[in-house]
Amino acid sequence: MAAAALIRSTRCNTCRRYLLQSFTRVVGLTAQNSRLPNEPQRRQFFTTPYLNIKSSHRHLSDRDASAASNNEYFITNESANSSQAVPWYLQVEPVIEPTHPAVRQQEIPAVPANAPPITQEILQHLSLEIGLDDMVLLDLRGRDPPPALGGNVIMVIGTARSLKHLNVSADRFCRWLRSTYKLRPYADGLLGRNELKIKLRRKARRARLASSSGTISDTSDDGITTGWICVNVGSVDDPSVVQNMREGGFEGFGKVQGGTRIVVQMFTEDKRADVDLEQLWAPKDNVKAGDSEENHSYSTGGDYQVRSMPPITSENNSNHPISNVPRPLRRVDLSQRRSFSTGAGQHSARTDVDPESGYEVVDAKNESSRQEPPLSAIFSTLKEMSPEETIEQLGSGPEDKNSTEFLRDCYSSVGTSHNGNSALRLMLGAAGVSAQHPGYTKEYLWTLFLEQTASGYRISEPLGFEIASAFLVPRRLDAKEQGRTASEFVDFDIESAMRVMDNLSLNGETIIRKHRVYNMMYEALILGLRNERLDDVRLKALRIRTLMTEIGLDWQSEDTRETMQLRLLLGDVDGFYEIWHAIAFNEGSRTADDYELLFRVHAEAGNPVYARECLGVWISMMGREDPPVLPSASIISAIARCAHVAGHDADTFRLLSASDEWREVERLILSDLRTLEQLT
């Protein structure tokens, strides 16, 4: 029965297939499914000629599959060998990955030529130790006009990561400069280590109190979080120069003035983008493309040729053809904007016409050059006159133009030139104020100065010096204009002189480095001692000394000792000894005249404390000078007067730690001291 059932099952195609699969599973073989007759024919394509397929119904056996794998391995090796056979100049170079943005932020800028040796060390410290990013170095040396920080400045700009990092960076940088290079940097905008924390805590407390009471706290800028700190490193000197100065073998204190000034600008990221100092101090060639297109339309018109025009004025017919001179399209600018040119143009004596506006343009530079010879002669004549002659020749006042022959010659020489008349009136006004002419006042001179500068005319340095000196001349005793006090008059005079110096310094003049102008300011303050408190006068003297220190004046001129004397008379002891130490530092040794001035000025100042300190320190130093300062009649008299002001008497005063030469003349000092006691 089983055999009959088996035979019947083989008649069915499906049953027969199932029966065969049951046997093959037991043996461990895998049955191959036959392709259905309705399946479309497929042809397999290969890239190698080693495999040939005759029919789509033919299947690869195990031996054929192994042969195909061997052929594929052979093809792979052949392609590798073919790539190695390619010459080096035909091989494709591997793609180099771009630098990480963090690496670009920490790049150190290149040091310019002839920079101080400390510049590279400062950049290394700011980048590696401080951690400033996106550092930029701007070489402002030789900039015309020079920046307000000075004419020899190297500026470094960097970005701090946060407000806290900004304050910590500036504080650590200043401490590093003081400890490593013994410099005295000044950080503008830097708060102390705990001061910032305290102020921020107080600000947060006020905000909480305001929110609890239902009011809105003041969110205006309180100066705490400015996001900008300017570290003025100061004048950086060449170490070789300092070493050569130290090898001189002198005694004293001070430092070498001059050199390159380094300024480090530290910003937060937002503040740096807002201020944009790089664009402000960038050279003219590196301006932005947008600004260049707006302000210089002709520079963006493509390549064009320029013909040299004849210097004479000629009228050309516009119908004449001009070849090979392509010109850009003319752009009409309707915005009200004034353009200033810094280039040197071709100046002529004629009056040109502006092609854009149609107005006549007067060449003020040529006009001033034509009027320079008569004005120079008038200026020389005024300087040679005495005050009495000046008052007589200037007539009754500013409105007088023909009462004297001198005035008629002056106004006829300048003609109708506006610049010449303005400069002449300014020159006569300065001479009249200096001679204390009753018709010329300092207020009138100040008005003339404002008119001259507002018109755009430059003032020469000699004339500017005369104007500043005229403002500092003592006023007449009967001057009671507008009911102001003597202190207010002195403040007006000094402020006016400083404004004149500031205007000239912006034009590149060197009047701001003249000691004589500052000495006249000190003399004006001394005249105000009778009507003003001593503390107020000292504060004004300190302001003048700070200005002189920031400018970096050298103490080698003839007016240096006069400046030193005036400072002590005004109570500025620190300013006095600043110059006193600089004399030894610059000249190598002090002379007998210097010590005579030292003791005499302390006696004239009349301060017992300063006089006692001077006697206790500098009498013993005279024997240590090279060459030693020997006794003389003038120094003996000055020491006696200084001892009298200090409160010493002839019975108790002795020369302590003095040299043998000075011990021998001690009796002469005591004799002069007894004479002074008898006179008082």
Curated annotation (Swiss-Prot):
InterPro entries: Atp25 (IPR040152), NT_sf (IPR043519). Gene3D superfamilies: Beta Polymerase, domain 2. It is found in: Mitochondrion inner membrane. Residues 311-322 have a biased composition (Polar residues). It is a peripheral membrane protein. One of its GO terms (biological process) is mRNA stabilization. Residues 286-296 have a biased composition (Basic and acidic residues). Disulfide bonds: none annotated. Residues 1-60 form a transit peptide. Residues 286-326, 338-374, 384-403 are annotated as: Disordered. One of its GO terms (cellular component) is mitochondrial inner membrane. Keywords: Membrane, Mitochondrion, Mitochondrion inner membrane, Transit peptide. Its main location: mitochondrion. Probable mitochondrial mRNA stabilization factor. Belongs to the ATP25 family. PANTHER family: ATPASE SYNTHESIS PROTEIN 25, MITOCHONDRIAL. This is ATPase synthesis protein 25, mitochondrial. It comes from Talaromyces stipitatus (strain ATCC 10500 / CBS 375.48 / QM 6759 / NRRL 1006) (Penicillium stipitatum). The lineage of its organism: Eukaryota, Fungi, Dikarya, Ascomycota, Pezizomycotina.
